[in-house]
């Protein structure tokens, strides 16, 4: 009897060496998919991925006789005992095992075919142990004779999945419906995740032809992809919706949204007029690129004539979004192109209206952005819909850098909001000792009263900031001052 391996690596090496040679290409592709997949793969999805030819070029190629009668048995025969098949617990989360899950599938109901979740879709494949993944991607297997061909490198694996997903999407057309989707088990997965794989390192350059085909406005694939997947909010449309009938999607908008710079540049060369075209949830390609944190594409669009004053949702300008994200180069270019640093915007993230780029830069702690905005005329004493000025916002940060910047630009340190609260009230209530110290040194009124009669000392005591209490008292705060309800700070 052969001696058993003494280490996990030895065990894995032995298992890999015993895999039938004819199955090794399938096994390797299965391992690649499992290593880099952005979510658990169900049995049928992984079975189909394993059969995709890795060198099929710009089309989707499959091995002859590629679809096995029993996908789970096929996967386990190729990979066991390194992988296992388990119930997909994600399917139990929505309703805690309620009847809705049980009623999703009915073999006899063709009308519900698109909503079915069969056994293969309810079971996912995973490595038997986390160390299997670690071994397959390690230098140890790469340097081990006889099994080094199982070593998985990130870029080829991402390229394989990107090509596979795009190949599936390029089979979609305007007549898409749930019945057709059911015939393509990879369709939903491909729609949701191909961008993740294509964006990895330089993978997109290897699949340029396929991407160009998907984003060709004269072909049906882009509209079909957008019907299948809510790209902007990253939620698959499992609910049935009407099939698309109009190829009205703006390719440049979605290229910018997804972060594909080279593709965006090619689309701009083909249709420069689309640079300001309305595209979807974020309105323009420029705003989509900024919201999705692709500053390199924003710079490209600005160089090609993007409108710097276009507004998106909540009337937000590109300068507002770029200031929020901290994109110094984009902010500078926007201002150089004439963007208004005092344009008023709404922001549901902080439940306000009439904020300017300076406000959001301060709220996010973007010191350099704030400097640029102030240098180009941002109003340091502007008030939002609650009467708060920039200094109120800066006072919430532990560091005094932002507040000092505003004070050096002649901000009114005693300006009050609609409740009569000054920036010193705010800093005291938050316990920001450095900011309170700065305000007192710069002449802030230590006993300023709000409309309720509250002083900074009241705020510090209410929230238990003893250091701030002592500091305020040392600067002459009146401990016996009465609020409007006749309470005192003591």
What do these predicted regions represent?
Residues 262-263, 296-297, 329-330, 368-369, ...:
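Conserved ankyrin/ankyrin-like repeat signature
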